[in-house]
From Swiss-Prot:
This is 1-(5-phosphoribosyl)-5-[(5-phosphoribosylamino)methylideneamino] imidazole-4-carboxamide isomerase. One of its GO terms (biological process) is L-tryptophan biosynthetic process. Keywords: Amino-acid biosynthesis, Cytoplasm, Histidine biosynthesis, Isomerase. GO terms for cellular component: cytoplasm. Pathway: Amino-acid biosynthesis; L-histidine biosynthesis; L-histidine from 5-phospho-alpha-D-ribose 1-diphosphate: step 4/9. PANTHER family: 1-(5-PHOSPHORIBOSYL)-5-[(5-PHOSPHORIBOSYLAMINO)METHYLIDENEAMINO] IMIDAZOLE-4-CARBOXAMIDE ISOMERASE. Belongs to the HisA/HisF family.
Amino acid sequence: MNLIPAIDLMNGKCVRLFKGDFNKRKDFTKEPHEQAKFWESEGAKCIHIVDLDAAKTGSPTNDKSIKKIAKTVNIPIQIGGGIRSQERIEQLFSYGIEKVIMGTSAIENKELVKDLSNKYPGRIIVGIDAKNGKVSTRGWLEQSNIFATDLVKEFSSFKIASFIVTDINTDGTLEGTNEEFIKSILEITDIPVIASGGVGSISDLLSLVKFENSGLFGVIVGKALYENKFTIKEANNVLSSERLNDFDLNRNYYA
């Protein structure tokens, strides 16, 4: 299971939201490309970027920062936020982005996802953001009546790289993940799953290890890293397969 550090962009800055609320945002001082480079030096194997401005409006405004990150690091980058056309995807690929995340567009235009996953197999990720099990779109500003599990079933026949599933109620809280939600997704798909939302300690990471053999490929972490709850080096050390037996999964490490 891989730890994937997150960079959420607003107005060219690194920010974090609380439960997806744009009015509850916290800005961080490092420039996005500096933050990405630091995490690469800590041992990150991939960087997760979300363009929050684009997610909200559909119009990309952080491309300068995105390009700079892509030029600064030598590890794969996956990016989401306002990606709603083939033209936008190809533009991001031209910047050096490895994979793109389709969220709102996946729900509103499933044929586009199917076509693009056929054209770019293994490079399209479907992002599913859910609140109380139901999907939210457009930067989490709109709530649907569609169950996340129904979408996962539908997209599991596509040639996508993975699902990223976010539990909005835990995102930015540092209070732990929604294990039942994660489990419900893993039970219905053979496609790799990346979980997001709620990780606040090493113990939270360890609690997800049991899902690794069920298809949990990685976990996205943002606020906990920014606020120094633990480091990527510490997490990688703990999550390395040869070290897991050293830890009591019921004990609270670095809480």
